[in-house]
């Protein structure tokens, strides 16, 4: 069975430090410049503590009619951060996402270092590949049976 680290996105993880004076406006700018839908919030020691997604920005800034340049990173982030270990199974990751009603999981190594991000899309692509591989094997077997 595949592990999380095998299918997690290998895009660069964008982070912002809590208590750095950064605002929701800064986060939106980071998201746009880096073409990402989420940013991990880390503490001063580099440990992950929260996440800011596009949805968080809409719910906590736009819908509340708050100026993005006045609201702090800590007030926008979702916390505590829900994570998955790099060598956990895809099945475990799917259950964690379903149970918590989230679309992304931060992937950690044993030392709590961020090594990737796993999204629902990553899991769907992985499952689609498995189905296509199985179908190709079936067709090969079917062809072999038809020849005999």
Please report, for each region that a protein language model flagged, where it lies by residue:
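A glycine-centered beta-loop-beta connector
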Residues: 31-34, 39-55, 97, 105-121
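The conserved cystathionine-beta-synthase
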Residues: 17-35, 42, 84-101, 108, ...
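Short, charged helix-to-loop "capping" segments that act as catalytic/coupling loops
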Residues: 2-21, 43-47, 109-111
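Tandem CBS (Bateman) regulatory domains
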Residues: 1-13, 53-83, 89-98, 119-148
């Amino acid at each position: 069975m595949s592990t999380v680290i095998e299918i997690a996105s290998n895009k660069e993880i964008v982070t912002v430090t809590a208590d750095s004076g950064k605002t929701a406006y800064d986060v939106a700018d980071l998201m746009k410049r880096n073409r990402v839908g989420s940013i991990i919030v880390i503490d001063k020691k580099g440990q992950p503590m929260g996440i800011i997604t596009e949805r968080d920005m809409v719910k906590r800034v736009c819908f509340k009619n708050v100026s993005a340049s006045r609201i702090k990173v800590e007030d926008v982030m979702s916390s505590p951060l829900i994570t998955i270990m790099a060598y956990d199974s895809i099945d475990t990751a799917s259950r964690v996402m379903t149970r918590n009603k989230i679309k992304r999981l931060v992937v950690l190594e044993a030392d709590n270092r961020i090594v990737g991000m796993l999204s629902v899309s990553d899991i769907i692509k992985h499952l689609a590949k498995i189905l296509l591989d199985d179908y190709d094997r079936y067709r090969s077997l079917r062809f072999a049976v038809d020849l005999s």
